[in-house]
From Swiss-Prot:
GO biological process per UniProt: ribosomal small subunit assembly; translation
Disulphide bridges, residue numbers: none
Name the UniProt record assigns to this protein: Ribosome maturation factor RimP
Gene name tied to this protein: rimP
Taxonomic placement: Bacteria, Pseudomonadati, Spirochaetota, Spirochaetia, Spirochaetales
Record keywords: Cytoplasm, Ribosome biogenesis
Origin: domain of life: Bacteria
Pfam family membership, one: DUF150_C
Length: 148
């Protein structure tokens, strides 16, 4: 799995403070231009969980900002929670799950590791499994699930 800085994800740095101001973490932001329409998908989480009203609130806050950043009002936007057993698509998502349970396929042992994500950095993460801290570099992570 490759690590991409938050600042390198288009519009993430501009949107993250708005989402955090509403009391949520921005897990992922995906902005695609298809034909004449921009498609935006935002994934948010909160310690209390995420409901439809939360998604609506974030949508109403982010939509005008995204439109201004892109320079277009032809934007469709979807805001959702990570859901249960979130399949991690980008290593940067691990930041949102520090302190939570994860299941990680570790290529170095060709098996799943289970534990609590203790620390995340640009090289890898520390997983606490059976009271033992295990350093797992992103290059050894084939896939991962969080929010178990």
């Amino acid at each position: 799995m490759e690590f991409i800085q938050k600042k390198d994800i288009p519009y993430f740095s501009e949107c993250e403070p708005l989402v955090e101001g509403l009391g949520f973490k921005l897990v992922d932001l995906n902005v695609l231009h298809k034909k004449d329409v921009w498609q935006v998908k935002a994934v948010i989480k909160s310690e209390k969980g995420v409901g439809i009203k939360d998604c609506t609130s974030v949508h109403r806050t982010l939509q005008p900002r995204i439109e201004a950043l892109i320079g277009s009002q032809d934007v469709t936007m979807e805001v959702s929670s990570p859901g249960i057993n979130r399949l991690v698509k980008r290593a940067v998502e691990f930041y949102a799950f520090v302190g939570e349970e994860a299941q990680i396929w570790d290529n170095s042992i060709t098996d799943w590791r289970h534990g609590i994500i203790k620390e995340v950095n640009s090289e890898g993460l520390v997983l606490n499994s059976d009271n033992q801290d295990i350093q797992i570099p992103y290059q050894d992570i084939k896939k991962a699930r969080c929010n178990l």
